[in-house]
Amino acid sequence: KKNSILKKNHSWMNAIKNNFQVDDYESLIPNADLVINLTPDKEHHNVIKILQQLMKKNSCLGYSHGFNIVEFGEKIREDITVIMVAPKCPGTEVREEYNRGFGVPTLIAVHDANDIHKQGLEIAKAWSFSIGGHRAGVLESSFIAEVKSDLMGEQTILCGMLQTASLLCYEKLITDKHNPAYAAKLIQNGWETITESLKHGGITLMMDRLSNSSKIRAYNLSENIKKILAPLFQKHMDDIISGEFSAEMMKDWKNHDQKLLFWRQKIKNTSFETAPMYNKKIPEQEYYDHGILMVAILKSGIELSFEKMINAGIIAESAYYESLHELPLIANTIARKKLYEMNKVI
């Protein structure tokens, strides 16, 4: 924005420091071969409207999430190639993984209605390579499959389940007279610690961190949770496939995010979010030994979301990314600043 450039704000200073060319839309976009739109979903329509007026003929437009194309139904100029590179984690974690010499699993896709030159897939491959996605795995998908699986994962195991389980587990521990500070830390850092085993060995390795008797307890709890939550997960999947979920979300956008902001404030004021700090170190194994219910919740949530996506026609690899592989990266955000951080970056 011109105003940001004139004021030389923090983002301007950061860009200059890292040798990026900085200018406004009107100066940069007409000369660009590839324009990548990384703005929030709710801003896409207005941003794309401006971009299409400025982008040169036969250039390429990139998305990191296909909501605008699939759910809003945005139409892009026929000469513009439209691609997607969708890392399966929050943007902050893409950078973290790249900096440590790795990357995150990434879905790539080409919008069939906008691939007149048949070069979209090669551009998407190059983009995914540039952010390190090839080190973790790049899967060719479609815009619609990415959107539906992404929404299902976030609404169930990745965000919805972690948030609800954090609040319920904390309240249970407090009811049982546990130290509030310890309880909050056990849950806040427990998700990150426990899901790290998922990254290296899936549900099997996570369960192997438990004693034999604890494995049995976690398994039985998990099966009971699946029976209880199966109808709810199915409703989420049905609403996402039908478009009802997206329609309701877009209504809230038009209402200035009234529901979203109310829910965020409600979560921010919970006893879990406001719990005191626990300054002592909790040993890694203690998170497993005292987190049997958390393990059961993760197991049931992963399996349910994966099964519902498969039954809806989403390919197994994509369902896996959205139900299991992204979990540690979402859990990292909770470990930083509890649920507030997760809700802020998703």
Swiss-Prot record:
Q: Which residues bind Mg(2+) 1?
A: 150, 154
**Which residues hold Mg(2+) 2?**
150, 322, 326
All residue ranges annotated as the KARI C-terminal knotted domain in the record? 142-286, 287-346
Q: Which UniProt keywords apply?
A: Amino-acid biosynthesis, Branched-chain amino acid biosynthesis, Magnesium, Metal-binding, NADP, Oxidoreductase, Repeat
The EC number on file is 1.1.1.86
NADP recorded as keyword: yes
So which cofactors does this thing need?
Mg(2+)
Name the InterPro entries for this protein. Answer: 6-PGluconate_DH-like_C_sf, 6PGD_dom2, KARI, KARI_C, KARI_N, KARI_prok, NAD(P)-bd_dom_sf
Pathway(s) per entry: Amino-acid biosynthesis; L-isoleucine biosynthesis; L-isoleucine from 2-oxobutanoate: step 2/4; Amino-acid biosynthesis; L-valine biosynthesis; L-valine from pyruvate: step 2/4
Q: GO CC: one term?
A: cytosol
Residue positions binding NADP(+): 11, 41-43, 91
User: What biological processes does GO assign it?
Assistant: isoleucine biosynthetic process; L-valine biosynthetic process
Q: Which part of the chain is the KARI N-terminal Rossmann domain?
A: 1-141
Q: Describe the reaction catalysed, as an equation.
A: (2R)-2,3-dihydroxy-3-methylbutanoate + NADP(+) = (2S)-2-acetolactate + NADPH + H(+); (2R,3R)-2,3-dihydroxy-3-methylpentanoate + NADP(+) = (S)-2-ethyl-2-hydroxy-3-oxobutanoate + NADPH + H(+)
UniProt GO MF annotations: ketol-acid reductoisomerase activity; metal ion binding; NADP binding
Q: Which domain of life is it from?
A: Bacteria
Cofactor binding remark: Binds 2 magnesium ions per subunit.
Q: Which Pfam families match?
A: KARI_C, KARI_N
PANTHER family associated with the record:
KETOL-ACID REDUCTOISOMERASE, MITOCHONDRIAL
- Can you tell me which family this protein belongs to? Belongs to the ketol-acid reductoisomerase family.
Record function comment = Involved in the biosynthesis of branched-chain amino acids (BCAA). Catalyzes an alkyl-migration followed by a ketol-acid reduction of (S)-2-acetolactate (S2AL) to yield (R)-2,3-dihydroxy-isovalerate. In the isomerase reaction, S2AL is rearranged via a Mg-dependent methyl migration to produce 3-hydroxy-3-methyl-2-ketobutyrate (HMKB). In the reductase reaction, this 2-ketoacid undergoes a metal-dependent reduction by NADPH to yield (R)-2,3-dihydroxy-isovalerate.
Please name the NCBIfam families in this protein's record.
Answer: ilvC
The entry's protein name is Ketol-acid reductoisomerase (NADP(+))
